[in-house]
């Protein structure tokens, strides 16, 4: 196979880098998607993490990066929040935390979470490293802890720092930021001016190399190789010539080539240095850039030969060092560099011209060597027969022809060295190419033997070079010829169809890479003529990696043999898409080497590595399976694929295994590519969520139920709406101390409008309120009754108002409890959170049916969090409503003091029987009674008679009030009242008369009233619900605003001592119904007393809540 450049395409080697750096320390790490704001699902987990946690990879994938599935009872909640915060803010986290394995056993873990960025600087992944430090924790005894407290905090953190140093050294070493400094301690380079990131980036990057590393296919290296090739030819020519023709006799002659010889030796030495910094192609086809690997490779291959060839023998002559003749023979070792010529033949074998040129050069070099040998043989024959005066050697014959014979016992005279070399070369070439011409012939036995050998070599070389060059190349390099033929066809195809450069590069690279993998051999074509038995055994051996998966453990040998015939090998280059979203899935793929990523909408859903299985679960129906995501190669990947068509055929032949295979494949798939698989995932997730809500279990799950809202959208039956129900009895409200004893931390607020003339207006707004000051909920106190009450649909129906009599329009205060009979069977509002949490998940997913499982899971999590957030807001709202209820109770107590029944014959039926009331009868009561409400107002600075107070025209002048609005919106202008500390006294700054049953008390410059009515009743409390609110427009004027003073109550129902706050009704929220709203007169009330009498009114609040 021809020597190629190697695999040089840009690769995303992030996964390989992480795995390589962790190798040798601990490989417990996971990768999570940082682009998904909710959940940060795990896209890759190492085998070490699966072994540490006890979970399978399929169980870990797509779970949250916060590792909630590892939390347990003793897991620190503060660290949980810190992990969540670091993930949300995409910052680094490090700390020791207690985790729990799948079997429930705890272990201490040193957790490091690091954000990974892409080439744009965006955080796309989280790298979480897990280090088991349980053994280190166990070694710390209580005594050691006491000693640590005495000696300081430095020793207490020794185990933590040492474990962290070992763990984080791996992460920082990934980008080369780990430096070894003095005392062999590992320290972090915190130089802020360093541009390199502290951790590897998740991106496609070119192969990195040092500035001093030479590419073996670079232009400079190619030119240098040609220079070394010429120097090698020079050595191959000069070394034999100097050894045979020069010798030690004429040193002056040897000096003529000394300079060139030294220059060649210098070139060889430089070549050795460059070879230590030149890349090479490994057996797997990868280009090696690491200097250490290059050095090891060169030392174990060509270093020894190059070193011997570079020994400076010619320097001995340069310094006039006398050496023996054997030293010249050592220079022949340089001829071993000719073996490098074979590499050139491999590299340039696709160029026939270069190959023929090199072959001719080798033929000429061989003739040169044989000419040198021929001269040595003639010289030895002359020296051996010098005493016998033989003159039959080829040198004697040459001397005679050239008229320069030998004399002086054949030691002097003779032809020149130049003439002798030319004659010898002529003889060898004529002998190699033909039988010779006879002008130079062999005369002695030694010469004849050499001539025979020359003829034999000549015949072989002649046939090789001149006769059978094409045939020899086809026989020896048939695979090369096929490779070049296909390469040429591919280039012609590209040229004819005018394909773009990028597509051309992809095609050529894919062809070269696949050729390097299978060497151009089509295994199917090669094995088709073999019997099925032998072919099955061969394919089982070739595909043993995928057949060793747990998925095929239950398959019989016959099933595996049949299945192996339908397995094919595939190759994917970096950046190539194996599958695209919406494609018909034709096979199930097994990753043998390399790494891939699953993409959807440019978002990483999973990262696949060696040993991962991708495909789809099989359906009972024979239908086309569409993929729901793209599968893209990050590096060069070798794949094995099971063709689905053949798989179905095998499963039909082995039905006993088919059922098991269909069940197991959905668990063994690292990522399921079936379109619509997300619906099943969400269904399973919802079921798991419901189980976890009803029966919380697992390690460290926070089983806290949050309050929720369930909107009851069912309509009331028409008959029930029209049915008149008697008014529910109203119970007195217990004191604050009694409420504390009950300890109920859940109040249920139910509001209902009274049934007016238009009919009952039902509305449903049950709100579940949680109070934090109670130790137990009402459900915990009475579970049986709670379950009964939970099944009932609470509806408060109030009877229709009787127009004949004055209606009770007293506002009701919401305290969250409707206790009509003061019994345990009273109905309360209770709504479980399981229903609202499960209904959104059980419903079919909306939107694009091809949405990924991870996206739907994230949406489900978002919905869950939004519901929890809504529940939290509702909890806060109900607390505010409860507080508002307390304020409204105070307002109602205030209204009790100003409302009294309307009687035409007397002003106040309870305090006086006279037609015109006395001053005592104008004072408010301390408790609520069932008579009609009345309002007493004493304005400052004016005195009126009793007749004037009872006169209706005064009332109409002061208040221009619609009677329908008086009962719901009383307004009064009065002065601030104060309760003195000694008794129940109420101060009015300009009190000119004293009502009946009230005693005037003078203290200093102030006047106070004491209630002495015998009819005082404190057994009843205000109504506990209110459906009407005050209009801000009515209360906006300062002239019409009413400042009411409410004395507080004690436990016994009397007014407590102390300062009583003043409430202004203009600050209360809400609005009046326009039909019942009164327009208050803007006439100043400074000098007039006021009487406001309520009357029957039909009140309808259009803004009431319908549930």
UniProtKB/Swiss-Prot annotation:
Location of the motif Selectivity filter: 434-439
List the InterPro entries. Answer: cNMP-bd_dom, cNMP-bd_dom_sf, Ion_trans_dom, K_chnl_volt-dep_EAG/ELK/ERG, K_chnl_volt-dep_ELK, KCNH_animal-type, PAC, PAS
All copies of the PAS domain together span 18-90
Q: Which SMART domains match?
A: cNMP, PAC
Composition bias type Acidic residues, residue spans: 710-724
Recorded GO cellular component terms are:
monoatomic ion channel complex; plasma membrane
GO BP of this protein: potassium ion transmembrane transport; potassium ion transport; regulation of membrane potential
Q: Which CDD domains match?
A: CAP_ED, PAS
Any ranges marked Cytoplasmic in the topology annotation, and which? 1-225, 277-298, 349-357, 470-1107
Residue ranges occupied by any PAC domain in the UniProt entry: 93-145
Biased composition, class Polar residues, residue ranges:
686-702, 961-972
Question: What name has this protein been given in UniProt?
Answer: Voltage-gated delayed rectifier potassium channel KCNH8
């Amino acid at each position: 196979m021809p020597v190629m450049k190697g695999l040089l395409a840009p690769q995303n080697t992030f996964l390989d880098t992480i795995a390589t750096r962790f190798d040798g320390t601990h490989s417990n790490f996971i990768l999570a998607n940082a682009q998904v704001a909710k959940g940060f699902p795990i896209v890759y987990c190492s085998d070490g993490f699966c072994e540490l946690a006890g979970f399978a990879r399929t169980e870990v994938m797509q779970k949250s990066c916060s590792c909630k599935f590892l939390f347990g009872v003793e897991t620190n909640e503060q660290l949980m929040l810190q992990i969540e915060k670091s993930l949300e803010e995409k910052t680094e986290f490090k700390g020791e935390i207690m985790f729990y394995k799948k079997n429930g056993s705890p272990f201490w873990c040193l957790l490091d979470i690091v954000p990974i960025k892409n080439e744009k600087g965006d955080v796309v992944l989280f790298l979480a490293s897990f280090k088991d430090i349980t053994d280190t924790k166990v070694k710390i005894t209580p005594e050691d802890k006491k000693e640590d407290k005495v000696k300081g905090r430095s020793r207490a953190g020794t185990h933590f720092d040492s474990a962290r140093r070992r763990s984080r050294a791996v992460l920082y070493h990934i980008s080369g930021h780990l430096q070894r400094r003095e005392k062999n301690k590992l320290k972090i380079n915190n130089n802020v001016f360093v541009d390199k990131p502290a951790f590897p980036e998740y991106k496609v990057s070119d192969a990195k190399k040092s500035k001093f590393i030479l590419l073996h296919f670079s232009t400079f290296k190619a030119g240098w190789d040609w220079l070394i090739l010429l120097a090698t030819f020079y050595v191959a020519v000069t070394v034999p010539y100097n050894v045979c023709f020069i010798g030690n006799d004429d040193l002056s002659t040897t000096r003529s080539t000394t300079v060139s010889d030294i220059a060649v030796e210098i070139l060889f030495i430089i070549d050795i240095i460059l070879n230590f910094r030149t890349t090479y192609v490994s057996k797997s086809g990868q280009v090696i850039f690491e200097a250490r690997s290059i050095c090891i490779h060169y030392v174990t291959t060509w270093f020894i030969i190059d070193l011997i060839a570079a020994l400076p023998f010619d320097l001995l002559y340069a310094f006039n060092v006398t050496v023996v003749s054997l030293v010249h023979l050592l220079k022949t070792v340089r001829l071993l560099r000719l073996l490098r010529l074979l590499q050139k033949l491999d590299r340039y074998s696709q160029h026939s011209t270069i190959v023929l040129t090199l072959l001719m050069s080798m033929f000429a070099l061989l003739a040169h060597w044989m000419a040198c040998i021929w001269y040595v043989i003639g010289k030895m024959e002359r020296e051996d027969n010098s005493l016998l005066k033989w003159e039959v050697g080829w040198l004697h014959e040459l001397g005679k022809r050239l008229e320069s014979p030998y004399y002086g016992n054949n030691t002097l005279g003779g032809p020149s060295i130049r003439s002798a070399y030319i004659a010898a070369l002529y003889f060898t070439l004529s002998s190699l190419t033909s039988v010779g011409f006879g002008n130079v012939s062999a005369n002695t036995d030694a010469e004849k033997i050499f001539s025979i050998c020359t003829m034999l070599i000549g015949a072989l070389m002649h046939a090789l070079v001149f006769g059978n060059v094409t045939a020899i190349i086809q026989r020896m390099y048939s695979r090369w010829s096929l490779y070049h033929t296909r390469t040429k066809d591919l280039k012609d195809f590209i040229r004819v169809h005018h394909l773009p450069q990028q597509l051309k590069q992809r095609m050529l690279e894919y062809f070269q890479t696949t050729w390097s993998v299978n060497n151009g051999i089509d295994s199917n074509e090669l094995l088709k003529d073999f019997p099925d038995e032998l072919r099955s055994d061969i394919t089982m051996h070739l595909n043993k990696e995928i057949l060793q998966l747990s998925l095929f453990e239950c398959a019989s040998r016959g099933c595996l043999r049949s299945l192996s015939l339908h397995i094919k090998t595939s190759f994917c280059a970096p950046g190539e898409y194996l599958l695209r979203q919406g494609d018909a899935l034709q096979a199930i793929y097994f990753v043998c080497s390399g790494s891939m990523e699953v993409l959807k909408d440019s978002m990483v859903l999973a990262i696949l590595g060696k040993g991962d299985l991708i495909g789809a679960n099989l359906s009972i129906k024979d239908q086309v399976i569409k993929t729901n995501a793209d599968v893209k190669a990050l590096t060069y990947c070798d794949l094995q694929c099971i063709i689905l068509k053949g798989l179905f055929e095998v499963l039909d032949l082995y039905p006993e295994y088919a059922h098991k295979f269909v069940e197991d494949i959905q668990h063994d798939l690292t990522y399921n590519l079936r379109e619509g698989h997300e619906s099943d995932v969400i269904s399973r997730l919802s079921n798991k969520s419901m189980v976890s809500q009803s029966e919380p279990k697992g390690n460290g799950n926070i089983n806290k139920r949050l309050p929720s809202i369930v909107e009851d959208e069912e309509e009331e039956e028409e008959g029930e709406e029209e049915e008149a129900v008697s008014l529910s009895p109203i119970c007195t409200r217990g004191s604050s101390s009694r409420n504390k004893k009950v300890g109920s931390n859940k109040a249920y607020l139910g509001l209902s409008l009274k049934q007016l003339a238009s009919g009952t207006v039902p509305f449903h707004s049950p709100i579940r309120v949680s109070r934090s000051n109670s130790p137990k909920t009402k459900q915990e106190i009475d579970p049986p009754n709670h379950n009964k009450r939970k099944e009932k649909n609470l509806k408060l129906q109030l009877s229709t108002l009787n127009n004949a009599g004055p209606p009770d329009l007293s506002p009701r205060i919401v305290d969250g409890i409707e206790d009509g009979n003061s019994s345990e069977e009273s109905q309360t509002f209770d709504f479980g959170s399981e229903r609202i949490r499960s209904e959104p998940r059980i419903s079919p997913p909306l939107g694009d049916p091809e949405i990924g499982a991870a996206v739907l899971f994230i949406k489900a999590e978002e919905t869950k969090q939004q519901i929890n957030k809504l529940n939290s807001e509702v909890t806060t709202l109900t607390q505010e409503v409860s507080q508002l209820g307390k304020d409204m109770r105070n307002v109602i107590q205030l209204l009790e003091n100003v409302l009294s029944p309307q009687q035409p014959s007397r002003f106040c039926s309870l305090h006086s029987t006279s037609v015109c009331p006395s001053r005592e009868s104008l004072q408010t009561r301390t408790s609520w009674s069932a008579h009609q409400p009345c309002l007493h107002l004493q304005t400052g600075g004016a005195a009126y008679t009793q007749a004037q107070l009872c006169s209706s025209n005064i009332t109409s002048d002061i208040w221009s009030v619609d009677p329908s609005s008086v009962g719901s919106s009383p307004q009064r202008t009065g002065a601030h009242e104060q309760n003195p500390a000694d008794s129940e006294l109420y101060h009015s700054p300009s009190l000119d008369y004293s009502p009946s049953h009230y005693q005037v008390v003078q203290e200093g410059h102030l006047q106070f009233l004491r209630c002495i009515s015998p009819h005082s009743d404190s057994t009843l409390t205000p109504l506990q619900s209110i459906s009407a609110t005050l209009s801000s427009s009515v209360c906006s004027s300062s002239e019409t605003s009413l400042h009411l003073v409410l004395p507080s109550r004690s436990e016994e129902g009397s007014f407590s001592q102390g300062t009583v706050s003043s409430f202004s009704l203009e600050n209360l929220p809400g609005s009046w119904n326009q039909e019942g709203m009164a327009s208050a007169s803007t006439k100043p009330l400074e000098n007039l007393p006021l009487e406001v009498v309520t009357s029957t009114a039909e009140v309808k609040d259009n803004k009431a809540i319908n549930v």
